[in-house]
């Protein structure tokens, strides 16, 4: 209770302490009125959970693969199966929005905002159909805020990402062929390779991790936020090896023509990369 005569005693907390059902209103709280998300209709429950049941029940799970069509209404695809893996095995599965270690999602096509949100150890691979007529390195294939809050794992994107790519990334490794505004914003860890142009305000609030950005037009300095980072050439043996290995894996997984061009002429492209370091 508030002391007598204090201003705190004059506060009315009724609105916080009571949850009245407002008549003729859709805004209310009732513990018994739980929203039905119809999870049983999701691809995770209809297909993935059934497909991998034997692996889940096995003392020594073996790798399994499933191919299926997903659409833009299949939200949070892979989240339920990822949760099941974490609940059953923790982080003990062999190497390979919340993809844990042991789960690989390979998407042929494009994706909406928030793909890879909370990536926590798994692998995410995105590329357009092999017969796509457009230049992958010049077209957006994933939406905004991809890999938001990722803590681990890898992502290889054969195309351009929207805004705020890898915002709050704290441990994931990603390769992409271009990003919109505010890339690597508030990043605290992990590694990002950008094989193309960035939007403005790159690395704003970036306090950890490393980014390697291809700066073919020598104008990246105009789009990076220099408040907390510095730009350096990629010269150290470790950086050169890491950069080349990530581009090579990107090409192997996505078939990226852009990545292959850079690998085939690595000596020519290396001086054009900038290392972004907090």
Predicted regions and their residues:
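Long, distal/terminal scaffolding or interaction modules
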Residues: 5-277
């Amino acid at each position: 209770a508030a002391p007598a005569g204090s201003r705190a005693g004059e506060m009315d907390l009724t609105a916080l302490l009571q949850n009245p059902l407002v008549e003729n209103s859709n805004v209310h709280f009732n513990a018994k009125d739980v929203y039905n998300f119809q999870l049983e209709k999701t691809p995770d429950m209809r297909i993935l959970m059934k497909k991998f049941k034997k692996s889940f029940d096995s003392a020594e799970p073996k790798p399994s693969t499933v191919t299926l069509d997903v659409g833009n209404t299949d939200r949070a695809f892979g989240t339920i199966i990822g949760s099941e893996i974490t609940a059953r095995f923790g982080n003990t599965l062999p190497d390979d929005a919340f993809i844990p270690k042991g789960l690989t999602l390979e998407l042929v096509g494009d994706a909406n905002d928030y793909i890879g949100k909370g990536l926590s150890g798994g692998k995410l691979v995105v590329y357009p159909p092999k017969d796509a007529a457009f230049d992958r390195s010049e077209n957006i294939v994933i939406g905004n805020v991809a890999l938001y809050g990722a803590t681990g794992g890898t992502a290889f994107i054969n195309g351009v990402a929207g805004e705020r790519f890898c915002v709050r990334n704290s441990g994931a490794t990603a390769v992409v062929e271009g990003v919109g505004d505010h890339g690597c914003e508030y990043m605290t860890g992990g590694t990002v390779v950008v094989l193309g142009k960035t939007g403005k305000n790159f690395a704003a609030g970036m306090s950890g991790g490393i980014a390697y950005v291809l700066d073919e037009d020598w104008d990246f300095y105009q789009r990076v936020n220099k408040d907390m980072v510095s730009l350096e050439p990629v010269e150290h043996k470790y950086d050169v090896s890491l950069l080349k290995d990530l581009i090579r894996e990107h090409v192997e997984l996505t078939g990226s023509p852009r990545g292959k061009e850079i690998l085939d002429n690595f000596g020519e492209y290396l001086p054009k990369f900038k290392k972004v370091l907090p």
